Amino acid sequence: MTPTPIPIPAAATAPLPTAATAPPPPPAARATDWTAWHLHLGTTARSAHDRVVTDVIGPTIRELAPGTPWFFIRYWQSGPHLRLRVGDLDTAARARVEAALTERLAAAGAPAPGEEPLDPAAYRSGAERLAAAGETGENTSVKALLPPGVHPAAYEPEFDRYGGRALMPAAESLFTLSSDLVLAALPRVGSERQRAVLALRGTVAVAAALGDPADRAYYYAHGLGAWRAWAAEAGHPAELLDTITRVEGAVTLDPGSHGPFAGWHARIAAHADEIREQSPTHPGMVLFSHAHMLHNRLGLSLLEELRTYAVLAHAFPVPEGTPVPASAPVPASTPAPRNV
């Protein structure tokens, strides 16, 4: 199920699609009453999943009141699908959203020419690989395929992953911002190179919230090691991983220039301060998951995310003689979303 990675050019300076400017965070984050749907497709084709984001989820969200919280992710369990969460809907609004999703998915979700229909055997093989690569709980086993369509679901926040219950509303506001950015960017992504560069620049914007250059360098180095380990657990051969992580020549990146991710960086940096004040968790542990979910929303694979960290670890190596941080800046277990 994991596509071949797209190499990121050394000079990662291609123009980025314009994305939404981040609004200021709410004065006080509060708990949201979430309604969830899983939008299942009969193909793993990235183009089909992009189409569901732009032609199904996007128009449905735009019909809601301005400022309605929402977010989406892409996932594999029970078959390829997008998980949509919308906040604070009353009963009538829930019914309208579900009806709109159902109507639009019926039109946009069918595989287009060149989008291969899902092979159940291939799903099981790929899902078994993903389940074995560091998953926990119910996702260590492969669930039966669900048919294409809109399936009501439950949202279970991952409190531990995002720094604790008190920090979850702030994390969810970042889910909304990340989803808004990707929804704005996808129609303007004309190549896989642009998609990869978006993920690269978004990750730089995240790392810049961690502090000095040494902190960022350790974040990239640990991220590279973690993703390589998870890729190996998923069954990818060492020779392939060597190829993906090989970066030659100079990489031109300005770590302080965030372009369309300027608002994203500002909100991430503010959240890093919240984590330092309210949680014993290293901010990098939480921000690593936010960077991963940006990759996920952009539709990038495990191997493509590994490539992101290979490029950044090459561009910003750990300075010689730098003390090892007291706590790891990235998690030791898989960052893949589970219940979100």
Feature names for model-found ranges:
Residues 1-340:
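An acidic, charge-biased composition feature
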